[in-house]
Design a protein with these regions (language model features):
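A conditional alpha-helix N-cap/helix-loop micro-motif detector
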Residues: 8-12, 39-40, 112-116
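Pre-Walker A adenine-sensing motif
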Residues: 9-22
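A short, structure-level motif marking secondary-structure boundaries and short turns
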Residues: 31-33, 104, 137
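Conserved inter-motif catalytic segment of the P-loop NTP-binding fold
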Residues: 64-135
């Protein structure tokens, strides 16, 4: 299956319709639940949906290492590629890896000022303009 078909058949399309087309630019969505209920996996699924549409994602992890977050992306992408019979999964994986930036703030070191500064540096030095920011913690 081609990436476009994977996008069209995503369960997120139902979610978007239920909130009248999605959150929209500048709006905030919040996912809350007890630890271990799948919040990170849910957010990675949303991020992968954006990444596979060619959009960039900035993922901020407050309680997990960068490697741990990347493992979530790898596992969920691999499952998606397998279950959808994704054509040219290697190219799609490369697009995902190039389109995401993962930062971590362990030990209660996160602040919105630090997040804004990191985004400003990404824009200025790497020309990385994310369409979505995921704050996971």
């Amino acid at each position: 299956m081609v990436v476009k078909k994977v996008h069209e058949r995503s369960p997120l399309r139902v979610f978007e319709r239920s909130i009248h087309g999605g959150l929209g630019t500048g709006n905030l969505g919040v996912v809350l639940s007890r630890p271990g209920m799948g919040k990170t996996a849910f957010m990675v699924g949303i991020a992968l949906d954006a990444l596979m549409r060619g959009r960039k994602v900035f993922h901020v992890a407050l309680e997990q290492s960068v490697d741990h977050v990347r493992e979530h992306y790898d596992e969920i992408f691999t499952d998606l590629a397998r279950t959808t019979h994704l054509d040219d999964a290697a190219s799609a994986r490369l697009m995902v890896e190039r389109g995401r930036m993962v930062h971590t703030y362990l030990g209660h070191s996160f602040s919105m000022v630090k997040c804004r500064n990191a985004l400003a540096q990404l824009r200025e030095h790497l020309h990385f303009e994310p369409a979505a920011v995921m704050i996971d913690g």
